[in-house]
Amino acid sequence: SYVEINNFYTMTVYEKGSEVVRMYQTLFGRDGFRKGMDLYFKRHDGHAVTCDDFRHAMADANGRDLAQFERWYSQAGTPRVSVRTAYDAAARRYTVTLAQGYGDASPAARETQQGPLLIPFAIGLIGRDGRDLPLRLDGEAAAAGTTRVLDFTDTEQTFTFVDVPEQPLPSLLRNFSSPVIVEYDYSDDDLAFLLAHDSDP
């Protein structure tokens, strides 16, 4: 039973809830999100529903298993994503390693943690001339755009971009693609360069 109904109506609940819903659009794009909404209303219009009902509609409309995504609703605390990068000039490969955790989470928050989250992590790579570089992940036939949403699902995961012509500067968590705290060792010069050139507002 619920002890205090006010727990459901705090600013944290509203703000986190809206960010979780926005992540569906980040994962599936506007068209995929619209398909999920259409299916949700077709199934549940006029009914009392749950967050699981909404998640199932998004999953079914887009043909994707979102069981891991449920942890956003049940795990307390703000995730931290630490980022490490390395560039191999000879191979023209740029690796990005992401690690997720909760840092100094309270004991109560740690008790709710069931495993890694599905984190949509948007990234771009900026060349020395300040322009976005085309992005192609290892195994892909061709580059696809200049911003890529990485499906970050493990405690630690490495993504490799290929055909990267120069040492880039990463533009991380573009469009605030998920409500996480990013940890990356930017220098002051790096931050000034991003301020001057990053296409992500």
Residue ranges and their predicted role:
Residues 25-27:
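Acidic, glycine-rich low-complexity/disordered segments
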Residues 1-19, 23:
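Acidic/His/Gly-enriched intrinsically disordered linker/tail segments
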Residues 35-36:
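Surface-exposed patches in mature extracellular/periplasmic domains of secreted proteins
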Residues 12, 17-20, 31-32, 42-201:
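Non-catalytic accessory/interaction domains
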